[in-house]
Swiss-Prot record:
This is Ribonuclease 3. It comes from Anoxybacillus flavithermus (strain DSM 21510 / WK1). Its cofactor is Mg(2+). Its EC number is 3.1.26.3. It catalyses: Endonucleolytic cleavage to 5'-phosphomonoester. One of its GO terms (cellular component) is cytoplasm. Residues 10-139 form the RNase III domain.
Amino acid sequence: MSKQRPYVKFKQFQEQTGIFFRNEKLLIQAFTHSSYVNEHRKRLHEDNERLEFLGDAVLELTVSQYLFEQFPQMSEGELTKMRAAIVCEPSLVTFAHALSFGDLVLLGKGEELTGGRMRPSLLADVFEAFIGALYLDQGIEAVVQFLGKTIFPKIREGAFSHVMDYKSQLQEFVQRDGSGVLEYKILQERGPAHNKEFVSRVSLNGEELGVGVGRSKKEAEQRAAQMALAKLKQLQQG
């Protein structure tokens, strides 16, 4: 795809994603690297750096709002830690790869020869620039809708649960205290196939410590462990 004329591949991208830009120049700018601009000075091109700046802020805001609404039990520190894991470079690169953003980038010949198209920092910047372009073209709701198809489902599936790994914390707490054996059990699986919800229970030596609900078994277990951890810490404090 990267060898095609720019306008052709951007039209194909819009058809494939169902995201049609009112101002297609913004879309093209989002994928225009500074090296391309430097090699095409006779043409009116603008690189994606300003859009990246804007997209970074929009991404932080929308992810923050989603986490705030979806995880009411999380503290400010926990929310900050989770958000950092979602908007960090490795995560953005993963999202960019999933959407084949590397194929769309307009690069200078030198940057192309040195493997710039697949450079992690470049792909992360492009993802942020695309968010900035989408925001300018269609507003915050369009960004939320896009993230609802690309990032938010991964959060619900527990892709970032390692950041707030309550199961490991609970296991360490129990082992340190010498309390006994933890057991997780899925109590209920409810809802339609496309929107399932799981209820998990964690017990210590047969005694229920916490119950959690989540969009995946993993998330439900994490939430149950979080409740159990809070309960044990409270008991410890007297």
